[in-house]
Swiss-Prot record:
The lineage of its organism: Bacteria, Pseudomonadati, Pseudomonadota, Alphaproteobacteria, Rhodobacterales. F-type ATPases have 2 components, CF(1) - the catalytic core - and CF(0) - the membrane proton channel. CF(1) has five subunits: alpha(3), beta(3), gamma(1), delta(1), epsilon(1). CF(0) has three main subunits: a(1), b(2) and c(9-12). The alpha and beta chains form an alternating ring which encloses part of the gamma chain. CF(1) is attached to CF(0) by a central stalk formed by the gamma and epsilon chains, while a peripheral stalk is formed by the delta and b chains. It comes from Ruegeria pomeroyi (strain ATCC 700808 / DSM 15171 / DSS-3). NCBIfam families: atpA, PRK13343.1. InterPro entries: ATP_synth_asu-like_sf (IPR023366), ATP_synth_asu_C (IPR000793), ATP_synth_asu_C_sf (IPR038376), ATP_synth_F1_a_nt-bd_dom (IPR033732), ATP_synth_F1_asu (IPR005294), ATPase_a/bsu_AS (IPR020003), ATPase_F1/V1/A1_a/bsu_N (IPR004100), ATPase_F1/V1/A1_a/bsu_N_sf (IPR036121). The gene is atpA. The keyword Phosphoprotein does not apply. ATP binds at residues 169-176. The record marks 372 as: Required for activity. Its EC number is 7.1.2.2. SUPFAM superfamilies: C-terminal domain of alpha and beta subunits of F1 ATP synthase, N-terminal domain of alpha and beta subunits of F1 ATP synthase, P-loop containing nucleoside triphosphate hydrolases. This is ATP synthase subunit alpha.
Length: 512
């Protein structure tokens, strides 16, 4: 077979023409030492603070300490396969996460990777995890209600869209239960809103340092109640490395900010920030940053303030969206004056204080109504609710004061006796089983009944039964009254009070 020169030259010409001249340039460094999830890297001279770097085997890390002769990198994953002398590559990108509606109904880790086995998330947008909070100009004061469906909270500690309300208490006092009920309560509002995005509320739940079984149970509960369709769960569990637990709240906030910045409304629950602070303390000490009070680093206040300041109500010029935050803090033995609790109390717009004592007395949710406050929520309360909630606060405050004195004296005058009786019944009325949130109108009617003496003759043990019967009666025979309160939002006095009283009188006559 002869050599065909023309054909060979044609092939050579073709190859020369298509010769790629691009050379891939990557800035690399070498691992000096590695251990406890921290790598010291030499040679990454131009790396930025907070930049992602890549180790062999695709393990990612984040540059946190930029020192004269080396870079301190925290590792998102196991450091077992990283050894001294390994090459580390810059990625030239600050830590970012996927954003958008594609995340709804999914469970992701602290970097936005799916961990629910439902395939990849094809998000079109990505956002930087740790961005600056909105300034003063884009904001507006909180004025729309964010209903939790809990009688004790919606009446006495109202929360508005764009508010930060801390849920604080010892372990096993029902902190997560309040947060979960709030998510479940949005189902009826979101379904009623139809296509009106301004009425819907999307929920993001961040589990920080919790057991995997606990997170799985929570996701199952959300799925059973049809709440996953408007929720995102971000999980950095106890078995995840500290950097993941530190990063998860920021990543989740970036996902929630997508809704805030597009004129929609979102709620984010951080469960819980005590564990994030512990993870950050671990990272800081291993990076040899100087410890401060309780061995936390000096910037632990900034850790939480820059996170919670991202929750805001934006004004009309910026789309009128909002991001509401419910951070959870676990106290040790009811000590609210510890470092982290005092920090977060000073950052937030109020707190729901839960007590072990009340929990064991069977008062659940175990809200201490005396210590709990909402600093901005009252302006977001519906007219109907604020008109019935005032007397409750007063009655319960007087009851707590009198109950303390009543232990000493046996012969009490009729007025004091009446005050104690009503206070006991109102306390009983504030109890609510888990996973059974009520609508705004139902809470208004129940509380109106309590403050207007409908329960004074009912035995204390029968209050729960009386309330359950009333709700059934209202839903069955007075659905139009509930709809009227929901849609018109009247102040419950004069004519409106007359309509509610008529329904209550009708029920009271049948109760036995």
């Amino acid at each position: 077979m002869g050599i065909q020169a023309a054909e060979i030259s044609a092939i050579l010409k073709d190859q020369i023409k298509n010769f790629g001249q691009e050379a891939e340039v990557a800035e690399i460094g070498r691992v000096l030492s590695v251990g406890d999830g921290i790598a010291r890297v030499y040679g990454l001279d131009n790396v930025q603070a907070g930049e992602m770097v890549e180790f062999p085997g695709g393990i990612m890390g984040m540059a946190l300490n930029l020192e004269n002769d080396n870079v301190g990198v925290v590792i998102f994953g196991s450091d077992r396969d990283i050894k001294e002398g390994d090459t580390v590559k810059r990625t030239n990108s600050i830590v970012d996460v996927p954003q958008g509606d594609e995340l709804l109904g999914r469970v992701v880790d602290g970097l936005g990777n799916p961990i629910d086995g439902k395939g990849p998330i094809n998000a079109k947008l990505r956002g930087v995890a740790d961005v600056k909070a909105p300034g003063i100009i884009p904001r507006k004061s909180v004025h729309e209600p964010m209903a939790t469906g809990l009688k004790a909270v919606d009446s006495m500690i109202p929360i508005g869209r764009g508010q930060r309300e801390l849920i604080i208490g010892d372990r096993q006092t029902g902190k997560t239960a309040i947060a979960l009920d709030t998510i479940l309560n949005q189902k009826s509002y979101n379904d009623a809103a139809g296509d009106d995005e301004s009425k819907k509320l999307y929920c993001v739940y961040v589990a920080i340092g919790q057991k995997r079984s606990t997170v799985a149970q929570l996701v199952k509960k959300l799925e059973e109640n049809g709440a996953m369709e408007y929720s995102i769960v971000v999980a950095a569990t106890a078995s995840d490395p500290a950097p993941m637990q530190f990063l998860a709240p920021y990543a989740a906030t970036a996902m929630a900010e997508y809704f805030r910045d597009n004129g929609r409304h979102a709620l984010i629950i951080y469960d819980d920030l005590s564990k994030q602070a512990v993870a950050y303390r671990q990272m800081s000490l291993l990076l040899r940053r100087p410890p401060g009070r309780e061995a936390y680093p000096g910037d632990v206040f900034y850790l939480h303030s820059r996170l919670l300041e991202r929750s805001a109500k934006l004004n009309e010029d910026f789309g009128a969206g909002s991001l509401t935050a419910l951070p959870v803090i676990e106290t040790q033995g009811g000590d609210v004056s510890a470092f982290i609790p005092t920090n977060v109390i000073s950052i937030t717009d109020g707190q729901i204080f839960l007590e072990t004592e009340l929990f064991y007395q069977g008062i659940r949710p175990a809200v201490n109504t005396g210590l709990s406050v909402s600093r901005v929520g009252s302006s977001a309360q519906t007219k109907a609710m604020s008109s019935v909630a005032g007397p409750v606060k007063l009655s319960l405050a007087q009851y707590r004061e009198m109950a303390a004195f009543a232990q000493f004296g046996s012969d009490l005058d009729a007025a004091t006796q009446q005050l104690l009786n009503r206070g006991a019944r109102l306390t009983e009325l504030m109890k609510q089983p888990q996973y059974s949130p009520l609508t705004n109108a139902e809470i208004v009617c129940v509380i109106f009944a309590g403050t207007n003496g409908y329960l004074d003759k009912v035995a204390l043990a029968d209050v729960g039964r009386w309330e359950a019967g009333l709700l059934q009666h209202l839903r069955g025979k007075h659905a139009e009254l509930l709809a009227w309160i929901t849609n018109e939002d009247p102040k419950i006095k004069d004519d409106a009070a007359g309509r509610v009283k008529a329904a209550l009188d009708e029920y009271a006559a049948t109760f036995a």
